Amino acid sequence: MALRCWDTARSLGSRIFGRYAFTVRALSSLPDKKKEFLHNGPDLQDFVSGDLADKSTWDEYKGNLKRQKGERLRLPPWLKTKIPMGKNYNKLKNTLRNLSLHTVCEEARCPNIGECWGGGEYATATATIMLMGDTCTRGCRFCSVKTARNPPPLDANEPDNTAKAIAEWGLDYVVLTSVDRDDVADGGAEHIAKTVSCLKERNPKILVECLTPDFRGDLRAVEKVALSGLDVYAHNVETVPELQRKVRDPRANFDQSLRVLRHAKEVQPDVVSKTSIMLGLGETDEQVYATLKALRAADVDCLTLGQYMQPTKRHLKVEEYVTPEKFKYWEKVGNELGFLYTASGPLVRSSYKAGEFFLKNLVARRKTKASKV
């Protein structure tokens, strides 16, 4: 998802210059500051930082947002991201390599990797650790993680190594996710639960979010993870029911995912449940609204909505680039439907750090309330 520096400059350069190729008559009616900007042209920072997107309003964007037959959509300006860099970014990357750990941030090419790993406004670095290796037994058409029928065996040292890494970073909120491991008897539930236990042993105050597979619908595996001591149980439905077969591996489906989320709350009512939906795959507004209602009916607490971005040419094409204004609309709808938290934006992902600050406070409040009862 994240673009390399040169690819970014090369692919976006023609769009940026082309967008500002005005006639002399059009230029004469512009404010002085904008004339000066057009005269000087964009610099390198405009290509890599997203600053250019702030110089015009989104409703002025003239490019196509919906894909026509046979075409590939161009990236709109609001989806440009900063190139990852900084001390925190390098520190996290080095620790991961030394302990042979993987992150979904890298494997899924997340566009927020620089912001989350580098810290940002809150100066707190966040990485989503991907357990059970870097190879998945599923083949979802939106995902860039490697796939194989028989991935390498689980690393017995991974739970302890993960706890060591988190302790070294000094984080107080961590997200654990994993590949699907249909080749393992319990889908890896015991492995995930053990990792949570190791984290809590080293730091009882740490808050742990687990973004889990569907475990082939095995509710005993769901229960094992839900009762492991985690604070947030997340499982992504990914898209609306009507697009499940097109987007996800045939072994996954909406109803199965809904049962996973519902069962986690049934066996551990104090856990915060969370899911995520990608937009831009061809869904309709009516389908999105019905999906949100179904999630609330299953007692899902938190929701994230983000733009689907095609990771490689082999994956599903983007059908539509949803505007930031439309994402704001879905955030409002989610809050009106009763979700405790709705994060909705083009670059929002299920593990996006903005939600974690809210969830941290939400979990803390629930624990305080429970202790007073």
From Swiss-Prot:
Its EC number is 2.8.1.8. The keyword Transferase applies. Gene3D superfamilies: Aldolase class I. Residues 1-26 form a transit peptide. It is found in: Mitochondrion. InterPro entries: Aldolase_TIM, Elp3/MiaA/NifB-like_rSAM, LIAS_N, Lipoyl_synth, rSAM. This is Lipoyl synthase, mitochondrial. It comes from Mus musculus. The lineage of its organism: Eukaryota, Metazoa, Chordata, Craniata, Vertebrata.
